Amino acid sequence: MRPAAPGTTPNGASSDIRHQRGVAPIPFGSTNSAIDAHHNSEIRVGRHRAKLDEIRESLKAYEHEAGLLSSHVALGSLATPSSSSVSHSDITNDNAEVMNFSSSSSNAAATTTTVSSAAVSNSNSFRTEGGGHKMRITPMPQRHLMMDTGANETVFRSGKEMIRNGNPSTTISSTPSTTTEESIRIHPAGYRYDMPTPAYHMNNNAPQYSPGYSRPPPPAYDSSPVNTRMTPVATDNYRTHLHMKVHPVVKAPPPNPTMLNHNKNMAPPPPPPAKSTISIETMSEERKADNIQRLYHTSMDKKTASSVVSINVASPHTTKVNVGDSPLPSKSFIIGPRYTADVDRKNFVNYKDELRPDPRLIPSTSDANHEDFRPILFKPRNLEITMKSRAQPPPPQYNQPSEPPPKRVSSPIDRTLLEPYIKNTRRVQPCKPNMLRFYMEQHVERLLQQYKEREKRMKQLEKEMVSAQLPDIMRNKMLGLLQQKESKYTRLRRQKMSKSHFTVISHIGVGAFGKVSLVRKNDTRKVYAMKSLEKADVIMKQQAAHVKAERDILAEADSPWIVRLFFSFQDDACLYFIMEYVPGGDMMTLLIQKGIFEEDLARFYIAELACAIEYVHNVGFIHRDLKPDNILIDQHGHIKLTDFGLCTGLRWTHDRRYYGPENDHHRVDSFSLPPEVAAIDKSVKVLNVRQQTRRITAHSLVGTGNYMAPEVIAKTGHNQSCDWWSTGVILYEMVFGRVPFHDDTPGGTQHRIKNWRNFLDFTYCGNLSKECLMMIQQLICDASSRLGSHGKDVAERTAQVKNHPWFRGIDWVNLRKLRADYIYIPRVTHDEDTSNFETFQDNDRADKPNVRGLHNPAFYEFTYRHFFDTDSVGCPSLRPSRRRSLRPLLENGTFNESVSEEDSSSHI
């Protein structure tokens, strides 16, 4: 070995550099232990940036000495003494590990021992205590194999050599080697890396071994970050990350004598574990239970209670984790495919060197993300285990051409798509339990209603096909078309609508809560009547229940007597009803024009009004606001009912008390007994009472003053017969030209209605028939004797009205097809004609909408789309003919061009 160059220290560093850094040079005659002590105390790799230049010079000297030693070994001038040994208890594995070798003879010749050690390869220089000669420790050719001895020990076999319990079974051959360091590196089959290197755990004496692939020598600590290489990661199928930490066992408090006496028959608690053993095993379905491959094994005692082991296990098979606490039996945990980011390896001791040579056991390369960890139950008190894994493409076969690794992304969702989602989710605010219950009740009711409507359409189609005597092939075809229509309707209901989809043509009406406008749909160019209600006014005047009832009856209505609803939607300020446009005007406008109707014309309108009321009652509603303003006339002179703003369906969603104040919704009558019933018998079931009574009466004061029934004003309870009172008042106004109980003073009209016997005047009746006067008297009377109030069902009660002598000769079946000279036919030139309405200019309020009305749960389930909205028109009465019959097609193969004179509005 050549002497140290002048101006250099024994470790190869320049004395000038040491003086520049303010460090005193080390004497050349210092012993190896003193030098190592000084080296460990002064030079700490990666700690003091001021030492970087010194370390660089040391590494250069180290490389120069390695070349000389290689030449010296080639000449065979050195031999390894048989008495040389390596003390594993003196080996530590830190950022730089130093090994002390002792020789049995101080005068022995300088020798070089060849030991495969990753820790030694990271050291800068080594010296012997005796002759002062340097010892170059180079890796030796070893191919590590693994076997289980059954005693939780890892045994490695290297040809004819074996290392057991940290002691070499045979000494290293002293035969001179003529091979250089570069020529003895091993490249195991199936691995891309070179130089297998055993390592040593710093916390115990058992040797630990690194993977079959080796890492290149560590780069200079002052090198550029670009040259810094991370630990390579092999391609894996299921990557499971295990994070294990052992805590010191907390001593239990002194036992309580009372508890000891109480639990004297119980077994004493086990002693605190002196050691925690962690092992990781993998099993495949092809292998048996007795052929388990152990990937990792380590032991940690009390001295290393704060140490942490963090590894990754990559295996397509089941992986088992055995955690044993001596003297307790071991426990097993099955690793599931859970994903987590890898933990930063800088947090753990000997992280790189505790890995077995197996491609399924790979190091961690990502940053720490402790929030994703999930602890496993039933673990020892002093051991923490957290794990997760993620699925990855299967690893390529080494005997086949390897494919490029898959591209890994940090997040499966693009940031541009994720930001709007996060922004919108912040707008979601928690709600009160009553509000959630309110929404769920309405939502479930709407789902049930949609199911009933779908079944109804199916039965109606089957009934029509039976009446048309269609063959089975045609029936199946029609049923298939209906299913396609149902699917399309389901998709249409999910599409959100807004006011921007329509263009306002003119405003034709105004009410207490909103206005009515003639609009045109932008995509179909069809004309509709749009009724808009301001949410703030609806909430302030407590009309949410009435709006809900109006929406329900318009959505459920399937009759030519009712104005059809096509869409309903809402925005932050208003509720919108998109309805059928009836261009003939209303009955009030006609009364103003004519003054008094002829008896035949009055009979015709009252007969059609009776049919409309019958339909409303059949679907379970009460209009409660019948007046000439709410009776529209189509272009053929027939009537349609509209404005169901005060309608009630005798349902809990139509009860104003159910809505209550905002965010405080209580169904006061849904699951509670009436006071009079509860006082009689408390054992009566709620459902039985609700089924029997079915909300027979209502108690709210509604309707227009001149047409209200006396029981409505007195709040004694009213039922469907109140609509027949309003019918009698309308008939009186038609034939007499005035309302019967009008008074100009406030409250005078209600006083006259309550005392109707004193104020009902039949003078100046003109040429009215006795039957007409009798009809008025039997409608404007007490509810007990009123027409339409007796009978078990709606049909029987309505028959009392239809069978009156005044209606003798009325064809109730073909009433809507009636064409007569006395029928008023409004003048309509085109579908956007508004000459029969009084138009006005819109004066929209510029005020911001009331915040209380924006997210009020009273408007849940308000959106609606008609089933036939795709093939219907805004003004159905303008359609020239009804749908063609399929019978001529089946009989003659062609359609019959002739169509009957049937009103097409009933076929939309």
Swiss-Prot record:
GO terms for molecular function: ATP binding; metal ion binding; protein serine kinase activity; protein serine/threonine kinase activity; transcription coactivator binding. Expressed in muscles and epithelial tissues including pharynx, intestine and hypodermis. Expressed in vulval and spermathecal seam cells. It comes from the Eukaryota. Residues 808-874 form the AGC-kinase C-terminal domain. Its cofactor is Mg(2+). Residues 115-134, 162-183, 203-225, 388-412 are annotated as: Disordered. Disruption phenotype: RNAi-mediated knockdown results in larval lethality in 50 percent of the animals. Surviving knockdown animals have several defects including a slower growth and a partial distortion of the pharynx. In surviving L3 animals seam cells are 30 percent smaller. Its EC number is 2.7.11.1. Keywords: ATP-binding, Cell membrane, Coiled coil, Cytoplasm, Developmental protein, Kinase, Magnesium, Membrane, Metal-binding, Nucleotide-binding, Phosphoprotein, Serine/threonine-protein kinase, Transferase. ATP binds at residues 508-516, 531. It catalyses: L-seryl-[protein] + ATP = O-phospho-L-seryl-[protein] + ADP + H(+); L-threonyl-[protein] + ATP = O-phospho-L-threonyl-[protein] + ADP + H(+). Residues 502-807 form the Protein kinase domain. Phosphorylates yap-1 which may negatively regulate yap-1 nuclear localization. Plays an essential role in larval development. Regulates growth, the formation of gut granules, lifespan and cell and body sizes probably in synergy with the TGF-beta sma/mab pathway. Does not appear to regulate apoptosis and proliferation. In addition, may synergize with the TGF-beta daf-7 dauer pathway to regulate entry into the dauer stage. Maintains the cellular integrity of intestinal cells by regulating the localization of apical actin and junctional proteins. This is Serine/threonine-protein kinase WARTS homolog. It comes from Caenorhabditis elegans. The gene is wts-1.
